[in-house]
């Protein structure tokens, strides 16, 4: 089972509203996209409906 966590506490609220979750991946993000897309070792990606 994979666990999903949102980036920072601020993104946590956006995560639930926009259904966004963080996936564990080894991907480097640019400095500009680092704040919006990446959060440390987690990458923000859109969640698909089940």
UniProtKB/Swiss-Prot annotation:
GO terms for cellular component: nucleosome; nucleus. InterPro entries: Protamine_P1. It comes from the Eukaryota. Keywords: Chromosome, Developmental protein, Differentiation, DNA condensation, DNA-binding, Nucleosome core, Nucleus, Spermatogenesis. It is found in: Nucleus; Chromosome. Its main location: nucleus. It holds the Pfam family Protamine_P1. One of its GO terms (molecular function) is DNA binding. The keyword Disulfide bond does not apply. Testis. Belongs to the protamine P1 family. Protamines substitute for histones in the chromatin of sperm during the haploid phase of spermatogenesis. They compact sperm DNA into a highly condensed, stable and inactive complex. This is Sperm protamine P1.
């Amino acid at each position: 089972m994979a666990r999903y966590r949102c980036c920072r506490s601020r993104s946590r609220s956006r995560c639930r509203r926009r259904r966004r979750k963080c996936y564990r991946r080894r991907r480097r993000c640019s400095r500009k996209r680092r704040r919006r897309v990446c959060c440390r070792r987690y990458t923000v990606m859109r969640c698909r409906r089940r």
